Amino acid sequence: MSLLPDADTFKRLTDGSLRGPGPAAARAMLAGISVPYGWIVAARNIAYDRRLLAVRGGGVPVISIGNLTLGGTGKTPLVAWAARTLAAAGRRPAIVSRGYGAKPGEVSDEAAELALVVPGVPHVADRDRVAGARAAVTRGADVIVLDDGFQHRRLARDLDIVAIDATDPFGGERLFPRGLLREPPASLRRADAVVLTRAAAVDAESRAAIRRAVIAARGGDSSMLWAEASHRPVALRDHAGGLHDLDRLRGCRVAAFAGIGNPAAFRSTLTGLGADIAAYTPFADHHAYGDGDLEALAATVRTSGAALAVTTLKDLVKVRRLDLGGIPLVALEIAATFSVGGDELAAAVVAASQSVAR
């Protein structure tokens, strides 16, 4: 058995869902590896805290949006929200990211997804985020939204926002690779704001308990901004960026597909929006679509009698088509909507964008 075959299997391995002697042995080995990993993380953080490692400015204010754990915490909708908030305030934001998964000269899936939902906002992908920020400034940006920046301490920031998934806030409370924590919860002391994502997925008592746990991890410091957000479908988008109302799904016969960690949840969302699902094809998370996949999907769409093909934005930017088998193809756009602290967080984002650049 491969220890890390895909993100979903890795999560089930670390949370104990995979049982038997093989997974148990793998967990024991991963626990051993997590010890030196923790030492490295601690040493690196101490070096930054004591200024033994240099922190560089990007030339303009920087707003970082990151997380404490591996895997999806709903960070991408927050990045899009921050970029829109800044643009609405008259700023010229650019998004800077590492560009995970992209080959040199190519655009990452995440960058392509953000280009659809926040058109006109430059996106610079660079392993060296300081260089990326400075490149964005040369393209006219007066504020940087740093994607996945919490652990990238080399680039100075004016606001540090951390997203925590309400359904698994602390990654099994174990450091990688035994768990999903990229660094210990005590690192939340660095955060200026914490956003509880997928907040509607848990009850009020659980949300309050997570907030108390965050404050405890910060040594009792409750001064951080606290916000709660949920991921809700807001529109349908095609590959050209065109917007379509969600009402188009109601009573519509659709053929759907998705390559995400929880494809059943996507199907449930479509059903909840009133779609009549004639065919549904799940793929593995992060699936790379080949010509054979697209031909098979087109055949499925045609034979199902669907009037519309629907997928996720994450998949649409990989498929890069306006139709499948002559049937229009659209993606469900998900956005972060705040139930607690949204106005305060927006004000903090705008205020940080007006800081004196370092």
Annotated model-derived regions:
Residues 232-234, 284-288, 326-357:
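Short, flexible loop segments at boundaries between secondary-structure elements
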Residues 148-150, 313-317:
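Short, polar loop motifs at secondary-structure junctions
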Residues 46-101, 200-201:
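Walker A (P-loop) phosphate-binding motif
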Residues 1-18, 169-308, 355-358:
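C-terminal accessory "lid"/substrate-recognition subdomains
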Residues 91, 95-220, 226:
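Phosphate/Mg2+-binding loops and adjacent switch elements
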Residues 65, 96, 164, 229, ...:
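Hydrophobic residues at beta-strand termini and immediately following loops
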Residues 5-59, 352:
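A transmembrane-helix-recognition feature enriched in membrane-embedded lipid enzymes
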